Amino acid sequence: MSRAAYLILENGTVFEGKAFGAEKETTGELVFTTAMTGYLETLTDPSYYGQVVIQTFPLIGNYGVIPADFESDSPSLKGYIVREWCQVPSNFRCEGDLDTFLKESGIPGIYGIDTRALTRIVREYGVLNCKISYSPDVTKEELDEIKNYVITEAVESTTIKEKEHFDAENGDLNVVLMDFGAKLNIGRELVKRGCNLTVVPAHTTADEIKAMNPDGVMLSNGPGDPSDNTEIIAELKKLCDFGIPTFGICLGHQLLALSQGAKTEKLKYGHRGANQPAKEVETGRVYITSQNHGYAVVSDSMPENGKVSFVNGNDNTCEGVNYTNMPAFSVQFHPEACGGPHDTAFLFDRFIELMKNNRK
């Protein structure tokens, strides 16, 4: 029989459920994702570093654990909240169950919670800090500790430590991927399009990248407050002066905008899920996209050289920027999907075209 577990919110609200995964207390930032599938990609997405994730879809774990679907080597999130988890998964690719995977990864989980009510609290009051505990009792000191929780050193904790290289079959373009907490599928999308890929740590300097003589630079997704990364932003500003074709995704999009003088802001509860609408400004066409971010570029803060290219269909926040003074563009959503729709995968082809045109 599962042990009782409690989710304690910073406002003192306590939800009771049952423990699964690793049994340990943890504190994190409480967020929700509306994705109906792709829970493995959610669990292994480095962008969830420091966060406790609620799955709004009620039944999770149906197809078990499939390592080929992972977006990183191991989870970075602090905790996992579901309504119900499937104890007998069924899939021809399945190599284990969710409970065992969370135990092996050191991630505590709670099931049996009313995730609908919990999500509505986050939607109404905004992102809250929380604690997974095994006692419903909480002292004022513990509540203060929960309230004061801050995600720190997010990029430093999720970036690779050493440079890695991957050759594409008949690859004729060389791309440097700056890893701020990159999802693996970004690299896969580039390699399958004929790009030889060099993945570098987040604090690689602009001069070091220039010395590699790349055809293009990809700025990856990643966790945390983008404005915390002052050294990286300064290097990106210098990198932009070199005129190398650049494509930014998610955190990479935000860091590129910050390097050009724009500002970012924290959203009330963020955009997380595989069903987020993004409207292309030029055409008015709406794409269904995969998103995972709690910050956004402030559209009105963009300099003259940055033109907003996509906006969110729900709240009209900035979802993309095209730059007129350099061969660069970026999007807030995830065109590599995994999990999610592939509607905007054409943006990788646009990047390929940009690199080839820059060669001429």
Task: Name each model-derived stretch.
Residues N196, P245, I288, P327-F329:
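Structural signature of beta-strand start/N-cap positions in the alpha/beta core
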Residues D114, C250, H293, H334:
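Active-site glycine-centered loops adjacent to acidic/histidine catalytic or metal-binding residues
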